């Protein structure tokens, strides 16, 4: 049996709502419904009764619940044990390309400088979309996630690392938004809410990317503008803020599993300020 089906079943039974379960699992609601149907087809029974927003476990669902919890706990324990024996002194940190380029690269350098030579700690820097990294964190395939969005799942712990400032930049001075093409740099799903109020609704991006460096290099060629971290843009030089634009403050969070066996190490690493250069 696919453990993802059981995990979805447990989340729906916990929230009693397909939409909230989908949000917690970072899936679409249709994907959650499909997984539940798959599980019901495999078992040959209905697991939930569905009446509008009133979702309840059937008798069969109630009977499955303790077994599903036991199976998932056993599976997680097995994954943890196998991962522990294979990883030794490896520690994995995940973030988007832009965060690595603009601030985490410098932080990683400081971590290496502060490590005791005999510690033998090896870092793995992973670059991926937030949704993929959250899944890896949940499945114990990732130790620490750095992101601009607070966690939505109860089993995650987090620490607010601070804030950094974004500004709208272009490659030449005294330019207005209406004169420039828009290059969308992905700063997280919730950033789109702010973006809507700061960029004209009919402004279709000529480029969408998760790399700040790529966006910066394309500003001149595409006659474009993009939201970039102020300190990083100042370090790079040759960039100018768009005349009729504002600045925007963004939070930065460290996220890990509540019961992570790397908790002590995480606390030690986070003593080194991630935003020290920001």
Curated annotation (Swiss-Prot):
SUPFAM superfamilies: Periplasmic binding protein-like II, Winged helix' DNA-binding domain. Residues 18-37 bind DNA. The keyword Transcription applies. GO terms for molecular function: DNA binding; DNA-binding transcription factor activity. GO terms for biological process: negative regulation of DNA-templated transcription. Keywords: DNA-binding, Repressor, Transcription, Transcription regulation. InterPro entries: LTTR, LysR_subst-bd, Tscrpt_reg_HTH_HdfR, Tscrpt_reg_HTH_LysR, WH-like_DNA-bd_sf, WH_DNA-bd_sf. Transmembrane segments: none annotated. PROSITE patterns: HTH_LYSR (PS50931). Residues 1-58 form the HTH lysR-type domain. Belongs to the LysR transcriptional regulatory family. NCBIfam families: PRK03601.1. Negatively regulates the transcription of the flagellar master operon flhDC by binding to the upstream region of the operon. This is HTH-type transcriptional regulator HdfR. It comes from Salmonella dublin (strain CT_02021853). The gene is hdfR.
